[in-house]
Amino acid sequence: QINSWKDLLSPELAGRVALPNITGTQGPLTLFMLSKALGHQGYGFEETIDNIGAKADDIVTFYVRSSQLAQLMNQEEVIAAPLGRFAWSRFSNSPLPFVWANPKEGQTGGMNVMIMTKGNGNEDLAYQFMDYWLSEESQTRIANAKIDSPANKKVKVSDEVAEGLTYGAE
């Protein structure tokens, strides 16, 4: 059972944990949460990186893709790892009894953004695309396909779909 982010570096889980590569979406988020759990101050992360480095032999791999992690977990080579909620469906449909942990330090979250280059000459088209992407119709399709959590608060999905997304009043 994972009660804290620092449990990922515990002797009990040594040799059974995967951490995300720092270059992926979950890498910096995991580094931040481990730093918080270990009681490190500031945003330099040197101490946290040193802690992870000291445990490198206890970490099965630093995964790059959630598909890689799913394979390792389904083969039972890894039993614990941080991952984004968007990838949870790969695990929730497994015959193995995976559960979502809720560490006392909290969960991580990322936010997708859309940007437009100033003076690009296609501002109207860019705004039309943004409106389309954020529309209830598009966001519902994206959520139901389990591609991403909806950004439009009018989107309604089934409980089954919601289980794999960041979704709801909170």
Predicted regions and their residues:
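Short secondary-structure boundary segments
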Residues: 21, 85-86, 145-146
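Short, hydrophobic alpha-helical packing/hinge segments within bilobed ligand-binding/sensory domains
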Residues: 69-72, 88, 126, 139
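Mature extracytoplasmic/periplasmic domains
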Residues: 108, 112, 117-170
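A ligand-binding cleft/hinge motif common to bilobed small-molecule-binding domains
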Residues: 74-75, 79-97
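Periplasmic-binding protein-like
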Residues: 49-55, 94-118, 162
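Solvent-exposed loop/turn segments at secondary-structure junctions
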Residues: 15, 23-27, 86-89, 105-108, ...
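Extracytoplasmic ligand-binding site segments that recognize negatively charged/polar headgroups
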Residues: 1-77
